[in-house]
From Swiss-Prot:
Substrate binds at L73, C74, H75, M110, E111. PANTHER family: CYCLIC PYRANOPTERIN MONOPHOSPHATE SYNTHASE, MOLYBDOPTERIN COFACTOR SYNTHESIS PROTEIN A. Homohexamer; trimer of dimers. GO terms for biological process: Mo-molybdopterin cofactor biosynthetic process. GO terms for molecular function: cyclic pyranopterin monophosphate synthase activity. It catalyses: (8S)-3',8-cyclo-7,8-dihydroguanosine 5'-triphosphate = cyclic pyranopterin phosphate + diphosphate. Belongs to the MoaC family. Keywords: Lyase, Molybdenum cofactor biosynthesis. Signal peptide: none annotated. The gene is moaC. It comes from Pseudomonas putida (strain ATCC 47054 / DSM 6125 / CFBP 8728 / NCIMB 11950 / KT2440). This is Cyclic pyranopterin monophosphate synthase. Catalyzes the conversion of (8S)-3',8-cyclo-7,8-dihydroguanosine 5'-triphosphate to cyclic pyranopterin monophosphate (cPMP).
Length: 156
């Protein structure tokens, strides 16, 4: 059953008024594949626009806080923690892992996915002058804890 549709198939925001406040956490990831020399420039701190990882981390955190402004039926949430980790993966990729937490009545999956996605978009934006062929891929939910649907963890 799609919870964002009413009995007549119209979009609506889910009413969470009666839901219990519980601890909730979600972790999402994204990857940005790029030329090896682009990744090396980022890792060596030689990008002319500055620290790519630092800017992408801040962008991801900001995006998590703005998710309800971007995704029409998401509730505005009082996130208690947003962490965005970026790391070089192999010779040609950046892996982004975003983790969001709160004590609330609805989950934080969309906030984690938005944080990872916007961090990836920020890397693309900062590096597009030197590598227009970058690919953002593998945006996905890794784990979700709390709430009625319980624990979800992607299979390795």
């Amino acid at each position: 059953m799609l919870t964002h549709l009413d009995s007549q198939g119209r979009a609506n925001m889910v009413d969470v008024t009666e839901k219990a406040v519980t601890e909730r956490e979600a972790t999402a990831e994204a990857r940005v594949r790029m030329l090896p020399q682009t990744l090396q420039m980022i890792v060596d701190g030689e990008h002319p626009k500055g620290d790519v990882f630092a800017v992408a981390r801040i962008a991801g955190i900001q995006a998590a806080k703005k998710t309800s402004d971007l995704i029409p039926l998401c509730h505005p949430l009082m996130l208690t923690s947003v962490k965005v980790e970026l790391s070089a993966e192999g010779q040609d990729a950046v892996r982004i892992v975003a983790r969001c937490k709160l004590a609330g009545q609805t989950g934080v999956e969309m906030e984690a996915l938005t944080a990872a996605s916007v961090a990836a978009l920020t890397i693309y934006d900062m590096c597009k002058a030197v590598d227009k062929g970058m690919v953002i891929e593998q945006v996905r939910l890794l784990e979700k804890l709390g709430g009625k649907s319980g624990h979800y963890k992607v299979e390795a």
